């Protein structure tokens, strides 16, 4: 009987121990998935709220459900538990093609890189409450082809729209940044390939537009930057191949138009830069095949290479008295140009500047003396003296006879 009781006691003890172990294991699993930070742990823990997941520091990092189970209308809350939501993390909702609408909270300060990129079903973003938003990261909404408009006018704290932030949003028709008075630069590729874009409102605070920022925005018909009184720079190819563009208004503050900035804008018919009194060099209008008239500022000292390359409809350009240099191929194949008047200040004309200008019949040099042509760009070879008294002969020299030479006034 004693042996039986002893055996029973051992079995009971084993059963109690096993039960305790199972309870401990179960409790541990529950705590691992808990949405609350554990007692005694000073570090914030990852937080889950419905389908949203955070890093414990206020940034949503993604979702816990299957992508297809995400709500089509996604409302990001200002708080999850006690955690204030201030950011959307890197690639948090990338490729979530089922999303159609997005509403973001007032607490938000940052939208991370690629946060909503390639959400092709997204048609609407409500940023009306986002008064604290300071940054939209690299590629944040790139490839959101269903998006038709973006109103950032309420985002008065916004200081940065990152590289490629809205690139390839081919359905986008309008963008309003007029209220974003803390933005100083549109970064490169920001609206690259937004071929449906017809209207852009930019803030007066703008100082620069990055390279390729609006490249390929083929539906854009006008760009008015005249109110951007602090704008100094338009980057290379910023409006390249915006072939629907017919009107451009630029401010007096502008000091630089980058190489190819308006290249291939085949709809542009006239260009008035006369008010750009801080501009000393010009480039960027090559391939503007419909351009007929150009007005240059009195401050201009240099026309860069390829500046008006193959602007074949150009019939009139008045060169300012301050001009000292004309770059290589600057007016190459401007076949509509019939006369050019070259100021006394001019000292250098580079190779091919007027080559192929088949309509050019008159070249009037204000100072006809001491002009020589060289074979080398560094003027190191023995030069040829030329006479420029006859305007027709001078035109022939420019377009054909000495078109491939480097001209210099000694």
List PLM regions with ranges:
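Consensus positions within tandem repeat domains that build extended binding/scaffold surfaces
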Residues: 90-94, 112-117, 137-142, 162-167, ...
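Bacterial N-terminal signal peptides that target proteins for export
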Residues: 3-16
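Hydrophobic core
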Residues: 17, 21-25
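A structural signal for leucine-rich repeat
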Residues: 285, 377-379
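Structural signature of tandem-repeat unit edges
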Residues: 9-12, 48-58, 69-87, 97-110, ...
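Low-complexity, acidic Ser/Thr/Pro-rich repeat tracts that form intrinsically disordered stalk/linker regions
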Residues: 32-48
């Amino acid at each position: 009987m004693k042996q039986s009781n002893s055996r029973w006691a051992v079995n009971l003890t084993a059963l109690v121990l096993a039960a305790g172990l199972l309870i401990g294991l179960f409790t541990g699993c529950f705590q691992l998935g808990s949405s609350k930070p554990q007692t005694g742990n000073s570090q914030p823990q990852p937080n889950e709220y419905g389908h949203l997941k955070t890093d414990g520091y206020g940034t949503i990092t993604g979702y816990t459900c299957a992508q297809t189970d995400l709500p089509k209308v996604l409302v990001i809350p200002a708080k999850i538990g006690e955690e204030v939501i201030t950011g959307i993390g890197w690639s948090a909702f990338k490729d979530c093609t089922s999303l159609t609408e997005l509403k973001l909270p007032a607490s938000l300060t940052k939208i991370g890189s690629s946060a909503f990129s390639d959400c092709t079903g997204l048609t609407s973003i409500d940023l009306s409450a986002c008064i604290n938003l300071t940054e939209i990261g690299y590629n944040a909404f790139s490839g959101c082809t269903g998006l038709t408009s973006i109103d950032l006018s309420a985002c008065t704290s916004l200081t940065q729209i990152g590289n490629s932030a809205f690139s390839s949003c081919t359905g986008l028709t309008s963008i309003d940044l007029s209220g974003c008075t803390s933005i100083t630069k549109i970064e490169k590729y920001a609206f690259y390939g937004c071929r449906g874009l017809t209207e852009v409102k930019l803030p007066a605070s703008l100082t620069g537009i990055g390279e390729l920022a609006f490249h390929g925005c083929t539906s854009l018909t006008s760009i008015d930057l005249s109110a951007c009184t602090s704008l100094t720079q338009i980057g290379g190819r910023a409006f390249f191949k915006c072939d629907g563009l017919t009107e451009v208004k630029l401010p007096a503050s502008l000091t630089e138009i980058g190489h190819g900035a308006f290249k291939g804008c085949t709809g542009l018919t006239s260009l008035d830069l006369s008010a750009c009194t801080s501009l000393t060099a010009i480039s960027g209008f090559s391939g503007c095949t419909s351009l007929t008239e150009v007005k240059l500022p009195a401050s201009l000292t240099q026309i860069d290479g390829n500046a008006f390359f193959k602007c074949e409809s150009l019939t009139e350009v008045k060169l300012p008295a301050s001009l000292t240099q004309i770059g290589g191929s600057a007016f190459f194949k401007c076949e509509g140009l019939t006369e050019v008047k070259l100021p006394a200040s001019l000292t250098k004309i580079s190779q091919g500047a007027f080559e192929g200008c088949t309509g050019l019949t008159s070249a009037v040099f204000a100072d006809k003396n001491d002009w020589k042509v060289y074979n080398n760009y560094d003027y190191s070879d023995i030069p040829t003296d030329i006479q420029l008294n006859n305007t027709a002969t001078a035109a022939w020299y420019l377009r054909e006879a000495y078109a491939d030479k480097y001209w210099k006034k000694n």
